[in-house]
């Protein structure tokens, strides 16, 4: 979203700059694509292996169309009560241009049709946003045994897609995700009000250009081409995922009851050894004697918090630069 977008800007604007390896933007983009495609493939392979192994412990990820009649009835009710009310279909036609889809949101493009009086099909295109307010992984109630069965939210939405388009049939569909340019373009030298410039740049970033398209499942070429044209991308910008998009949903699944024997033991971070015998001593005093390297998460982030707190009341501290930090429990 940042570095690749910056390289794309160089290519589009005809800027020729070389990095330390004497590679220009085009060469870097090609190398990045080859590396990321390989990583994506490895990720899918490892994930699919893990999901297959989970079946040995009674956890099955399946498709709605493979469920038994009773489970389908439950899923239909779940869809009508929880999913249908929060999904708003978006038409795409001459009067409704391709909608702006927010960065990293998952959507399904659907090709629907209506039978005309002469027997021919009238085709239309629509977008079904996959709502982020709902869990991506849905558990199907147990059938009285030890099996735990799950389906994916996007699979449920596409399975019941005809419910959103009464009077139309579903020809085909494709689930996809767009990555957008999230780089901040700020001219600190020219900006008269840096805060306002940052705020305006953040607003522009929400509508950044598309830089990558991820697709999964049975990809229909005509739908893929339609999306590529609509967001001004090319085939080289497409990443085909062997599985489902956005693996972050499995982080929550890791906390599912019944997986205790498969989890790693909780890890407690430690206080750096250099600070163990210096309780109460100023960190500035300690680092004045020797450098202190804190490796999080193996060592406690509390040290960094103490450093910031002490710097805040130190009259000799001029400024503090913070890049980013992960959420803490």
Question: What residues fall within each predicted segment?
Answer:
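N-terminal non-catalytic structural scaffold regions of very large proteins
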Residues: 1-319
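Single conserved hydrophobic/aromatic residue that forms the stacking wall/gate
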Residues: 322, 327-329
């Amino acid at each position: 979203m940042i570095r690749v977008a910056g390289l794309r800007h160089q290519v589009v604007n005809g800027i020729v700059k070389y990095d330390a390896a004497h590679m220009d933007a085009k060469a870097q983009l090609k190398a990045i694509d080859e590396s990321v495609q390989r990583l994506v493939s490895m990720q899918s392979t490892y994930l699919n292996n893990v999901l297959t192994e989970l079946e040995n412990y009674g956890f099955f990820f399946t498709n709605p169309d493979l469920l038994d009649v009773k489970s389908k009835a439950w899923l239909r009710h779940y869809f009508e009560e929880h999913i249908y009310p929060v999904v708003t279909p978006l038409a795409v036609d001459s009067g409704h241009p391709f909608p702006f889809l927010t960065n990293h949101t998952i959507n399904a493009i659907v090709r629907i049709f209506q039978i005309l009086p002469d027997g021919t099909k009238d085709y239309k295109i629509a977008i079904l946003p996959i709502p982020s307010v709902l869990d991506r992984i849905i558990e199907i109630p147990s059938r009285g045994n030890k099996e735990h069965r799950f389906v994916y939210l996007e699979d449920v939405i596409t399975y019941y897609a005809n419910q959103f388009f009464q009077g139309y049939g579903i020809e085909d569909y494709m689930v996809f995700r767009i990555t957008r340019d999230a780089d901040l373009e700020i001219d600190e030298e020219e900006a008269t009000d840096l805060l306002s410039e940052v705020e305006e740049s953040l607003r522009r970033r929400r509508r950044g250009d598309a830089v990558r398209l991820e697709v999964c499942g049975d990809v229909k070429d005509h739908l893929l081409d339609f999306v590529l044209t609509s967001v001004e991308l090319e085939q080289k910008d497409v990443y085909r995922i062997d599985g489902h998009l956005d693996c972050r949903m499995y982080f929550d699944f890791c906390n599912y009851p019944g997986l205790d024997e498969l989890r790693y033991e909780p890890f407690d971070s430690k206080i750096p050894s250099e600070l163990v015998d210096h309780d109460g001593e100023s960190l500035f005093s300690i680092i004045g004697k020797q450098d202190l390297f804190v490796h999080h998460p193996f060592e406690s982030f509390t040290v960094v918090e103490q450093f910031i707190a002490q710097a805040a009341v130190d009259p000799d501290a001029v400024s503090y630069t913070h890049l980013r930090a992960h959420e803490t429990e």
